[in-house]
Amino acid sequence: MKSLKLKLIIFILANSWIGVAQQLPQFTQYMYNTISINPAYAGSRETLSGVGLHRSQWVGIEGAPTTQTLSIHTPLRNDRIGVGVSFINDELGYENFSYLYGDFSYTIPMGEKAKLAFGIKGGFTQYHIDQTILNDPTVVNDQFFDDVSNRWSPNVGLGLYLHTNKWYVGLSAPRVLNTDYNNGGNGTIDYVALERISYYATGGYVFDLSETTKFKPAVLLKATNGAPLSFDMTANFLFNDKFWLGGSYRINESAAALGFITDLQVSKQLRIGYAYEYPLSELNTYTSGTHEVILMFEVFKSKRIKSPRFF
């Protein structure tokens, strides 16, 4: 019973700042997982690319969010078309969202260096709530948990991605349709499971500080109807094109955090990374922080790639 109550508390607390708007999960290493929020990114690395990520948020709090993502994308032979597929599994207490989406992009050259890509994303979102909480006698009659169910719902997303080898700017809405996951959706309950449209703006630049050192700042702005505005800033240094070291800061009404990021280019095809976040809210009394690991791989089939890809 104690375990149930702890999970129930984190479930309610987390959704109190989400409000009625279910958001896509947030990532410290968002700049390396762009395909999950912007379909126009598909194929931009000019080779077959994959990203796997695991995030354990607010470690030490039972029922805190955990997220896994897996994505693969590649350009087609004519270079202008990119395709990909992405999967996200996001669990929060007794609540689980799974996203399975395909990505398509079309790229237009903008001069000698810049490229502008248009993207569309389509697929399904599954909403699931653990029956354990619904069957427990202490909450079975609580209207807070009425009208929730397991269901699959279709959705689509759109994106723009303007980039060169030195900088990028992106705009996207990975879920365009507002989805009600409650049975009936009659508005008679205090909590409703709704997936609201989120808007993302991203950007980054690579500065050459010396022959062996590069500096890459990046930003992400996320706006969701019914949820606090979120702004992420990161600053990474790259040494000898092998080792990344940097930090991050998230400005958010309820989930501000300070982070540390490190990555290692193990080989031309393989890169691994780790990020740690410390919450700058009252949550830091109950958690040791957030941990995130990422694995990136690429299969080089083309002799056309002439410079390293920094994002």
Label each PLM-derived region with a short phrase.
Residues 1-7, 110-112:
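Positively charged n-region of N-terminal signal peptides that target proteins for export
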Residues 19:
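Active-site glycine/GP-rich loop and adjacent strand/helix microenvironment
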Residues 22-311:
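Subset of outer-membrane beta-barrel
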Residues 4-16:
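Sec-dependent N-terminal signal peptides
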